[in-house]
Amino acid sequence: MKNSMIIILLFLAVNVVNGQEKDTRLDGLEEEIEQLIKTYNAIGLSVIVVENDKTVYSQGFGYRNLEKKLPVTENTSFHIASMTKAFTASLLGILEGEGRVSLTQKPSFYIPKFQFYNNEMDNLITIESLLSHKSGLGSLDGSLVLFGENNRLKSLAKLKYLKPNGKINDSWLYSNVGYTIVGTVAEQVTSKSWDENIEEKIFRPLNMNNSFTSLEKMKSSNNYSLGYGVSAGKVQNVSFEKYYDYSPAGAIKSSSKDIGNWMRTWLNDGSFNGKNVLPKDYVYSATSIQNIRDGGDSKGTFLFGDGFGWRMESRNGHYKVHHGGNTSGFSSIATLYPFSNLGIAILCNQQNSTLPYLILDLITNRMLELPRNAISDYPLIISDIYTDDNKIKGLNEEKKPTNELTNFCGKYFHKGYGTLEIVKKDNSLFVVYPNFTYRLEHLYYNTFKMKLDEGDAQILNPDFFELNFHQNNEGKIGSIKINLQYEPVEFIKETDK
């Protein structure tokens, strides 16, 4: 009888312990995710949830290669685009911890002969300014993408000819070129490439074995995802983006398992598996608001700002640290709730997709035990990729160009960007940049807009860019103004310089 009672008590104790350990917060999650994947016509994604320094959920969905039906796993590498910025910023934080860099120092202290557009910028912009998007540089992506170099120093030498887009240290203007600059600082200080530094100081210590800084290295692995997009309801394969000299702003490819290690490190004051990787003081600074920004009208969300490679806000009473990534064929998001010791990341192989954010909301509400939304409550927003409609329109007969099309042809130059060329082919004009070629569609008089050439990566929306050709005093085409910045940038025709 005594032995029987002991067995019964042990049985009850085990069941009580099991009842305490069983976590029902994510019950039914996979069914909801699969429903959203179907609704969004998505191909594949990977989800990871870490809590209290442990992985509590890790799952791949769909395919990394649709044609070959290769499944997504937790080790599948996706392009994470601007999520890269937190890695580059951390590299500077590590170097500061080593006493080799000061984030309050000017970049010219480390980069020989480096200059901004004017003395005010040279004197006031610091590495911190660049990391928190308050330098005033803003978007100079046309320079990075259309005129990209394979030499960062050569590319940065152009900045002294480019006007700022905002107030110095008193604005929030997202800037990829800012991260290109700080990545170059790291290279100058260490005499190693940005790629080598990221591998040595972050990937290896965090056991990020399926993370890469280049397409070539990623393709040498046996588990990476292709990129996809949707056009008119149909799925299309999308070319990978090549980052040229702006890799520090967005070139990393990683897996959800690796990002799980990355998030655990941030939630553990910079330590991973008992070893300090990121300085604790830097972790605090990077996840604190360094620059206030307008977050728009978002219900239940307040206090918007940027740290170093991360964005911050207060969501339903929880401090949220996050950053997304969007590039040709991929959309991703990583989010930390530091005071709940919770990290969530979703990597998706769909272009310009809100799907990762919907899944993030589903998981956040479950893990933090907030009111949940039904799947049907989420708006269906599917953004089509940019495609060439193959319908070449003729000239606007009511508002014809002032010159024959052949007179528009030639090379045009700007010191801060470089040289572009206008060529004529089959009665159409094309603009030829160093890295891309776009067909020009006539709008009115001497104004044209760019149209995608089939097969180009989904980096810039060409429809956004207009080319306004201007006549000189002799009535000849002498320059082009292109809306590459807030103020149009003028390229001078070389024969008329």
Regions found by a protein language model. Give the residues of each.
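Bacterial Sec-dependent N-terminal signal peptides
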Residues: 1-24
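Active-site helix/loop module of the DD-peptidase/beta-lactamase fold
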Residues: 79-83, 95-138, 161-163, 184, ...
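Short, conserved catalytic-motif segment at the N-terminal edge
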Residues: 22-78, 100-102, 109, 116-117, ...
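Short, charged, amphipathic alpha-helices and their helix-cap/turn boundaries
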Residues: 29, 144-167, 192-209, 229-237
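Second-shell loop/turn segments in exported
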Residues: 21, 77-79, 115-118, 143-146, ...
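Catalytic nucleophile serine of serine hydrolases
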Residues: 82-83, 173-176
